[in-house]
């Protein structure tokens, strides 16, 4: 076991994590040169395209070090984005070491810090690496200073490399072997294996990626998953080199896969412990928690007959993404669809994009909302994730909204505009620190404000230099109200939003004005109203189209004209009683684009 090293790579988006992984695999000869391709561990198209890693992947590599010994290196590739922070913490707890990759031209950024703190908390040895030193803009001294200043680990002897050209990659591996301790664990103890990730394979069912902490596993063993208590016979075990290779045993310290004919991905939860059914471990490995969605949105098919196809697509996506939750929902305006729960905004975008791209769905998405806690006047507490389900104001004692702690990092030139943005979003400043040219701001901001467009606006006010990560803090009582939109006195449920009272008037007026531009004129007057409970806060009218019924009257008696006008008026009135206003697709999207003032 002294020759095993389990490590992962942590970095901010675009600092070259996947490229470095490619180089390491190449140096260790994991794949022949002709099989090598860019971002070899990112298997989804969308991962390659956006340049982000979503699912964890592994590669078991052997490397002959300069001291002549052969080491087994297990590389566990982790996602870098905040939405997937739980997956990151599981991947890190399977390692003894982590390469902290920092772009020498950009320095430390938010997600680097967030994931690095997670690693330090889990007791993982962090090895700093400066990447992209071949760039003319690279400033390694500055980056080293930032690592020491912001994260507080010694980086004087940080290895310098360029993953793109392959320069210095062997030095990275040497310092990894020198600094990272070998895994501890007892091959003879009862089996304990941590599930790092799991996905669905069409041929063999669920594939579980595990790190064996104690014990030994062989094919035909009967295993038990501790969170659910379910038991399965093991069919295959092995490692990825990144290609899969079956083995006869997996023992303590190794990272590999288990295939046990599991049909449901929800059975193999990330972070759960696998043990033997007969000689079971006494307690599971620490750190397991059920992942709860933070952001909800309604997904509806554009064509009503696509509902079944959408359900199937969601089922297939759920096979590979256990954190996605959905339940059927009916909206009077949009018909049948699903209410989906996501880990965060990036997760939501990815799910939408995969539905559109891999399953050819045309979707309408309602405005994303967060989960509110509502205390009723009779003392009961309910959770509301859909504005349409919010109880009437008289029955509500108080509404509590989720507050998140946001860490922002940016060059000092942009501090002013970022602070202004946070103040607009009802944020309260907790902390502000200067690290050289970089500034770290900590704010508490209501999650609802972050969900809509905070990230985009942050990028635009800081010209793309600011980076952020956030974590849930608590529920706090807030003065929020539900704004409903009425069209000709009928409530349109899909347009309801929950906003802070201070913004409700403005929001109601803006949405009503947008609707007025978008809804086509009808044969009768259409009234668009925004209401809070029974109180109307904004109104817009769409004037009727009318035919000139007097065109054929030349001169003659006024009563003749009056009769025609009265007849037209009566017809319009009758029409208004039976007619329903078709709300075009754009109206629902318009709601998402109403800017806060």
Swiss-Prot record:
Stored Gene3D superfamilies: 3.30.70.240, Elongation factor 4, C-terminal domain, Elongation Factor G (Translational Gtpase), domain 3, P-loop containing nucleotide triphosphate hydrolases, Translation factors
Boundaries of every tr-type G domain copy: 2-184
Keywords: Cell inner membrane, Cell membrane, GTP-binding, Hydrolase, Membrane, Nucleotide-binding, Protein biosynthesis
Membrane-topology annotation of the record: Peripheral membrane protein
Matching PROSITE patterns: G_TR_1 (PS00301), G_TR_2 (PS51722)
Coiled coil: none
Catalyzed reactions: GTP + H2O = GDP + phosphate + H(+)
InterPro entries assigned: EF-4, EFG_III/V, EFG_V-like, EFTu-like_2, G_TR_CS, LepA_C_sf, LepA_CTD, LepA_IV
Gene Ontology cellular component annotations, sorted alphabetically: plasma membrane
This enzyme's EC code(s): 3.6.5.n1
Main location class: membrane
Annotated localization: Cell inner membrane
Residues that span the membrane, as ranges: none
Binding positions (GTP): 14-19, 131-134
One Gene Ontology MF term: ribosome binding
Gene Ontology BP terms: positive regulation of translation
Pfam families in the cross-refs: EFG_C, GTP_EFTU, GTP_EFTU_D2, LepA_C
Alphabetical list of PANTHER family matching this protein: TRANSLATION FACTOR GUF1 HOMOLOG, CHLOROPLASTIC, TRANSLATION FACTOR GUF1-RELATED
Protein family per UniProt: Belongs to the TRAFAC class translation factor GTPase superfamily. Classic translation factor GTPase family. LepA subfamily.
NCBIfam families: lepA (TIGR01393), small_GTP (TIGR00231)
Role of this protein: Required for accurate and efficient protein synthesis under certain stress conditions. May act as a fidelity factor of the translation reaction, by catalyzing a one-codon backward translocation of tRNAs on improperly translocated ribosomes. Back-translocation proceeds from a post-translocation (POST) complex to a pre-translocation (PRE) complex, thus giving elongation factor G a second chance to translocate the tRNAs correctly. Binds to ribosomes in a GTP-dependent manner.
Full protein name: Elongation factor 4
Organism of this sequence: Burkholderia lata (strain ATCC 17760 / DSM 23089 / LMG 22485 / NCIMB 9086 / R18194 / 383)
UniProt gene name: lepA
